[in-house]
Amino acid sequence: MAILEVEHINKTFGRTEVLKDISFSLERGQVLSLIGSSGSGKTTLLRCLNFLETPDKGVIRVNDELLFDAANPVTKQESEIRKKRLHFGLVFQSFNLFPQYTALGNVMLAKELLAKSQPDYKARKKEIHAEIEAEAKRLLDQMGLSERMNNYPHQLSGGQCQRVAIARALALSPDILCFDEPTSALDPELTGEVLKVIKGLADQNTTMIIVTHEMAFARDVSDKVLFMDDGKILEQGPPEDVFENPKEERTRQFLSRYTNG
């Protein structure tokens, strides 16, 4: 059974149709890469999945649960949307860490805010805090940052900041982890360390959706690739099909820019 089902998503900004009848599915443990030129709708699609934008049409299901139906006003209530965001974790290309918190504090923050809504929070405050701190330290250690957890973002390299952002997204145990061009703000040396972390998550069967311009990485790490053009999914399939035997001329044109430099 698919962990994610997206059906006929449309999104318009003003008179510009940014997403046009987007449909795809993803199995648990799979990695999906979204590729395509800048402005093709990839980031908007991620933002719709994370409920940072509201689709004008379409349906989104996670674990066979209806999260969003544009025809059903109940699924568009802000109180419901806040809960549904927890199904997804989003790692931004520009990190978006809070500068006033350490690496550890950034990873703990969302989980602590969520814990305050628990009915037993006041009675178990110290215990809950200790549990959240231990999990945050484990995640930072997994990211290779155990010696940097008390550093502030301005004391970290771009690659380290991005790894903190990944740990922060993982802290809420999302069903699906999303990346929006996670290496676009990094130099080539730091790009490699972040891609290594993402590859490690893939090896652990973490379900992920990755917007990327790193074609070699997408080919290597993905179970499925979607090529988007002008707001539409023009081609989708296993990486060996999309990269080696694309059916659409537009896909071939796009990929030739990378293979030919």
Predicted regions, residues:
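Conserved ABC ATPase signature
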Residues: 152-156, 160
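Catalytic Walker B motif of ABC-type/P-loop ATPase nucleotide-binding domains
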Residues: 177-180
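Helix N-cap at the start of a conserved alpha-helix in ABC-type nucleotide-binding domains
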Residues: 188-190
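ABC ATPase "signature
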Residues: 236-237
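A short, proline-enriched helix->beta-strand linker immediately N-terminal to the Walker B motif
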Residues: 171-175
